[in-house]
């Protein structure tokens, strides 16, 4: 395996310097970058061969980290969203109304953004080190199956560094729910 393996501290440095990182999540490997760095984001889309219109997920270590990006409070669904992020080993991503702070490249041109508060200890530590959420999209070429091993991740993206760590053993990527309609999207 030729991909460099990074500590959490080195991974945070890479992201702050505008890099794209592969990292373990709850169920699959993800690709991430600073959501406010357009150049890094465009590099991520090129690597993944993903169209801009699809949008991506922001993954954070805490509700406080996503608050600048979403209209979360005082909504009919607020309590359900907040409670879902407290359930262990059941990662849930919510599509929520975006604030004006969210760049169009993150939303895919919509007025919503997908967000998740992670329970993965290494991703939490990374977001805490950065003090902001990161982009999270599965580490695979668009349309292919997500990768579930470090080796497969390195084979798919040989030029990327991978943050050390393990998947949490959850069998499927996070559920995605639309908060305003309460419909499950995935």
Curated annotation (Swiss-Prot):
One of its GO terms (biological process) is regulation of translational fidelity. One of its GO terms (molecular function) is tRNA binding. Required for the formation of a threonylcarbamoyl group on adenosine at position 37 (t(6)A37) in tRNAs that read codons beginning with adenine. Catalyzes the conversion of L-threonine, HCO(3)(-)/CO(2) and ATP to give threonylcarbamoyl-AMP (TC-AMP) as the acyladenylate intermediate, with the release of diphosphate. The gene is tsaC. It catalyses: L-threonine + hydrogencarbonate + ATP = L-threonylcarbamoyladenylate + diphosphate + H2O. PANTHER family: SUA5, THREONYLCARBAMOYL-AMP SYNTHASE. Residues 5-186 form the YrdC-like domain. InterPro entries: DHBP_synth_RibB-like_a/b_dom, Sua5-like_dom, TC-AMP_synthase, TC-AMP_synthase_SUA5. It comes from Hydrogenovibrio crunogenus (strain DSM 25203 / XCL-2) (Thiomicrospira crunogena). Signal peptide: none annotated. Its EC number is 2.7.7.87. It comes from the Bacteria. This is Threonylcarbamoyl-AMP synthase. GO terms for cellular component: cytoplasm.
């Amino acid at each position: 395996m030729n991909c460099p393996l990074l500590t959490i501290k080195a991974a945070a440095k890479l992201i702050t310097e505008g890099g794209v990182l592969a990292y373990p999540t709850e169920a699959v490997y993800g690709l991430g970058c600073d959501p406010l760095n357009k150049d890094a984001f465009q590099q991520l889309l090129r690597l993944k061969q993903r169209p801009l219109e699809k949008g991506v997920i922001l993954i954070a270590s805490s509700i406080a980290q996503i608050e600048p990006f979403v209209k979360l409070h005082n909504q009919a669904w607020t309590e359900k969203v907040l409670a879902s992020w407290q359930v262990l080993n059941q990662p849930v991503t919510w599509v929520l109304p975006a604030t004006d702070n969210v760049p169009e490249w993150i939303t895919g041109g919509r007025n919503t953004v997908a967000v998740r508060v992670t329970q993965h200890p290494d991703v939490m530590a990374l977001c805490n080190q950065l003090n902001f959420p990161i982009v999270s999209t599965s580490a695979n070429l668009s349309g292919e199956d997500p990768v579930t091993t470090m080796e497969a991740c390195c084979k798919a993206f040989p030029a990327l560094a991978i943050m050390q760590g393990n998947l949490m053993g959850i069998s499927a990527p996070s559920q995605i729910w639309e908060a305003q309609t309460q419909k499950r999207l995935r």
